[in-house]
Structures are given as structure tokens and as C-alpha cells.
Amino acid sequence: MDFKRVSYLGWCFVLVLVGLWMVEAKGKDEEDDDVVVHEWKEYSAVYNFGDSNSDTGTFSAAFAAVFPPNAQSFPGNLLPKRNCDGRLIIDFICEELRMPYLSSYLDSIDSNYNYGANFAAGGSSIRQTGFSPIHFGLQISQFIQFKSRTMALYNQTSHTGVDVPVKSRLPKSMDFSNALYTIDIGQNDLSFGFMSSDPRSIRSTIPDILTQFSLGLQHNFMTLVLVLLQQLFKEGARFFWIHNTGPIGCLPRQNMVNKTTPEDLDSAGCRNFENEIAQEFNKQLKEIVFELRQKLAPAMFTYVDVYSAKYELIKNARNQGEYVS
């Protein structure tokens, strides 16, 4: 495939996201067709959590090098760190906020965390069982350690009056509560389920997956999601930008690993079953976001419909001069 065209497709996707940039999800009792548009806010930093959709160096630092064609159209043509020929959505978000690209928390070479850090890792999932050991809960633990060590350094230097050069590569202690927390995770939980168990049982695992996600933001897959998000809230996070999962049934590997018949596909050539599961996941994720908005009232939660943006690009690829095979 022509990678210049792929980059063009990526730009189209970003334009769709920019259209959603400051759109906040509304509550269950409000009309879905309505949106609330907020004024532009200046964030002091960005902290990202997720999988290969937003990994800017964790996998390459922790496990194995990322080889071309990855990064071949990345600005500066640097050492490949992303599973993408160019920039990821998180890169465009940083550009839009006029910030440098995020350094991976585990990348020890030439990293700068003055404007945030990236904890996402290729293959990561919400639950601990998956393709990668760096699951969502561990990413949050890494963030907590990062914040704790940063705060300790500032406290130490404030008492001694001695400035430490490394502070120039770290965020200010007050930046954590004024940062944007971006999250794009969950696709690997579903993909791992498709590969390792009866596909028809995947739907029943979604509530457990999202429980763990919620626990991470607060403090168990819908319950874990809830707990994890609450955990981030306890650490001072107030501005959340949460992507739903993409159309998994449109991934080429789904047609490669499954015996596919024409009846299994929709008009865009995507597998119906996998996409139905993804849509069910997104429906429950959206409900979790609404619940968190009510529970954690001071915080702002923005739910981003990445599924629709990606599906429309895939469905209309020919109209954009791109051929998808």
C-alpha cells in the first residue's frame, strides 16, 4: 500500500477528531443528538494511557525494536517507536495543544517529561490477561510512581534551595491537576478474547473488562475500568479524554484468521460479528463515562466516538483516493 496515502487517510481521521475536540458526552437522561461545546482550555501537560494506538516508545524500549515501514514518514525520520508509518492520534493532539510529542515513561534515551508522559504500550489491555504485561492498572501504577517521585524532588529542592537540572525535564508539581488525561484502550481485550475463547462468550466478558477500567480511573472490564479511572481521579486527574474502541471487524487480520463468507461481511467489507461486539463494548463504555461524570462531579469527561470516525474513513476510502484491499 502507498504509505503517503495512508498518511493522508490519517490526516482525514484527525480532521474528524478535531471536529469532536471539545465535545462532552451528555448524561443518560439527555438527548444523544445534543452536545455541549466548551471553550478552549489550555492544558499544562498530557498524560496518555493505552495500547499500540497511542504507544510512542514503550514497546520498543521494553520488548523489541519497531522496524520499518513504521515511522518512515514520521517528522525527522527518527528511530521507529510507533506502530504507524507516521504520526499517531496522540501526536496530533499534542500538536493541536502546541506541545512536544510525548516521551514514553519507559524510554530512557533523550526523554523529556516537562509536558507530560506516555504510559501506553503496544499490546496492552484493561485486564491483566492479554498480549502484554503492561496492562492498564500497571500503567496507572507507573503514573502514580512518576507523580510521587516528581513531587518528592520538588519538595526536596524547595527545602534545600538547591536547583536540580533534571527539573527542566519534569512537569511542575501543580501541572498534574491541570493536565489532559487521554485514554485509548480496550481493543486488545476484545481481540484476545476472539483468539483465546469461544467468540460467542466475548459479549459476557465486557462488563468485567469495563469494571476494571473504571476502577483505574476512580481508584473493576466495565467495573475495572470504573475503578481504575477513579484511581486517577484520586491522584488529581480532572480532565479526561476517552476514546471508544474502533471497528475491530474491519482489521484485515480478522478476515485472515477467520473463515469468512460473504454473509459475514457488511457493505464496507468488515466482519459484522466483531463490529457488533465492539459496538456493545462502546455502548457500555459510554454508560461508564456518564456514571463517572455523576460520581466525580468536579472532573470533565469527554467521550470520543473513534469507532464512527474510523468506520466512515474505511467505508469511504475509495472516495478519498485510497484503495483498501
Model-derived features with residue positions:
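Conserved active-site regions of diverse hydrolases
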Residues: D2-S325
